[in-house]
Amino acid sequence: PTGLPPEAGSGGHAGAPPDVARRFGPDGATGVRLNTAIRGGGTAVHDEKAKLGLASVGLDWRSRDVRLSGDLGYQDNRLERTRSNVTLAPGVTSVPTPPDPASNFAQPWPFSNERDLFGTLRGEWDITPAATAWAAYGLRRSKEENSLANLTVSDATSSAGTVARFDNTRKDKVDTGELGLRGKLRTGGIGHEWVAAANWFRLDLRTAFAFDFANSLPNNLYNPTFHPRPDFSAATFVGGALDTPTRTGLTRLTSYAVGDTLSLANDRLLLTLGLRHQKLDIGSFAAGTGAVQSEYSASRTSPAVGATWKATRQLSIYANYIEGLTQGQTAPPPSGAAPLANAAQALAPFVSRQKEAGVKYEADGIGAGAAVFSTSRPRAFVDASQLFSAAGEDRHDGLELTVYGTPTRGLKLLGGATWLRAEQRSTGSAATDGRRVIGVPEFQATVGAEWEVPAVTGLALDARIVHTGSRYADDANTLKVPGWNRLDIGARYLTEIAGRLLTLRGRVDNVTDRAYWASVGGFPGAGYLVVGAPRTFTLSASVDF
């Protein structure tokens, strides 16, 4: 089909992203898909502008035993006067009330331009009816340049603060590949679904920055003061030349894995056993000079174990445990409106561990699940000397409930809730040990429903309620950020015009135009605040040919 879906949204944002797909040749063996998108204009936030250009083409060919596919795309994403996040300065003892969700306290000159070229190639060959080999390759070439002016609030009552110019450039090259073989067989009464695979990944990162933290300008969250774009002062913290960024990171990962899922007890018990060997080489380098800041080379063979018991045709019980070698966090240039002593330095790799156990039930169009899980990773933070480092761990233990399905004809439900205990452990400080991790709520939930209106053929209405509990904006848990609720609604209408299927969609997010802090935190140890989007309208139409 060919889709021609014009779109329009709040603030004059509009676009027309056609999507064309066709199959050719005997038995439709060859396929092509072309997608382009041009969107631009204002947003629901005052004076904020966004423009997106996207083009991608996909080709595939298939025979009885072979499948080949390739995709290539380009994206150009431009933002102007994007509303910044909000950092709380040291000494602030409370969290400011969020501003009007449509207000914009950003300076007139911040922007971000990002361009990405991406592509994939994949081939599969059915060697026998029970064995398939595959190979895949992917790449991404990205370039970004921006000029930012994030607000640092020094008085929570008045929300007075400052902004400073912070410019960045980034170029990165990502290459990844995979070779594998999978198949099925039986040994006696035991079924096997086995796999062997090799993966590799390479990231070459080049960055430069200029942060004029000493030349701050007054601003206010509620009553902003706007300034012309300042020139950089002599005290600017500089990392390389913005027009010629140098290598600041090089990551290489190779991985070899084998696994087998055994089917036992007449396929009621599934047991998965796996091993993965990883080798991780990481280098981080000072922007501009290229001096080595840290180099790590680590390898590890890690297990993966899982089991599923089909207690009945409707009920399954499962558990799994996975380990993996993971790259450490990388220090950002500034933190808390001040430069870091080891900007762009990577921390040591670590072994991540994840445990999960749960139940799933599905019958008569209704499904539900419950799971408990636990994960841990080193705790990264910025110490008193503005050094990005690690001490202790962040431990996440949680319970997740989900429900989905069609309880009655024409009514679809989808919902979930998560209770999470996220603690900092073994931090070496009584002020933070046992405290909650920045930005993680103890409870969050989403409930959505879609209803096909019986009296109007083709019309469906939907609604969604999102709840996020309170969070903390600092390691010591003295800055509590209130929780929030949001209501989103929408409608979809399907009809035929001149024999063509026409789909009309309308959506309103944040119906009540609630002001709230949507998220807290970002890079590890940071508690910056992000204002939630205002009431936003979106309309679209698509025609299939």
Model-derived segments and their meaning:
Residues 28-30, 65-68, 130-133, 189, ...:
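Repeated loop/turn-to-beta-strand initiation elements of outer-membrane beta-barrel proteins
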